[in-house]
Amino acid sequence: MIEAAESAGFAIKGILDVAERIGDDVLGYKIVGTDDDAALYAAECDFVVTLGFIKSSAVRNHIIDKLTAAGCRFATVVASTAHVSRHATLGEGTVVLHRATVNAGASVGRHCIINTAANVEHDVTVAYGAHVSTGAMLNGESRVGAGAFVGSGAVLAQCVAVGAGSVIGAGSVVTVSLTEPGIYAGNPARLINKKK
């Protein structure tokens, strides 16, 4: 994330993390405080939530809500080696990492992660807070629900939908719409665990 922000021309002022890490260095940038300190920087800085999908999007969403309540603005970051069509839309707080592609007519919502070398094809919809992992392929007109996770190298066939909060395992191939919340894996992708 840091290298993507640097390549996009952002000046990074510092990092917020947990209290135990204050003063630590991450790729040349100091951890200057915790999320509770966000309001101190809200007037002069835009924020990017760098935490990805860890078992669910709940922790990431909690941080986004906390920063929003503190009056923070969010940057949309597109790495210099990524391609985003001028006919695509990206929501506030979304990040598109190196070598990722977002093609014409695609709509990527707020606070999404389009990870390294992921491909979001024409007319795809990626809803709020979804994470499209490294090398995933979302074919034309497919849809990814809010807070869903599409694992590394997974493929969504054209026009299929993945439901909100669902997880698609690495390397899985989604050939039909999977609207029931759950964890899916395989080729073709099958439900392996229902979400409660």
Can you name each region flagged by the protein language model?
Residues 17-18, 52, 79, 187:
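Cofactor-binding loop segments of dinucleotide-utilizing enzymes, especially the Rossmann-like FAD-
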Residues 13, 45-46, 92, 146:
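Conserved acidic residues
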Residues 23-83:
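Phosphate-bearing ligand-interacting subdomains
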Residues 17-21, 36-37, 189:
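Short, acidic/turn-prone active-site loops that include or flank metal/cofactor-
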Residues 8-26:
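NAD(P)-binding Rossmann-fold cofactor-contacting core
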Residues 1-5:
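Glycine-rich adenosine-cofactor-binding loop
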Residues 76-185, 189-192:
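Structural signal for interior beta-strand "rungs" in well-ordered beta-sheet cores
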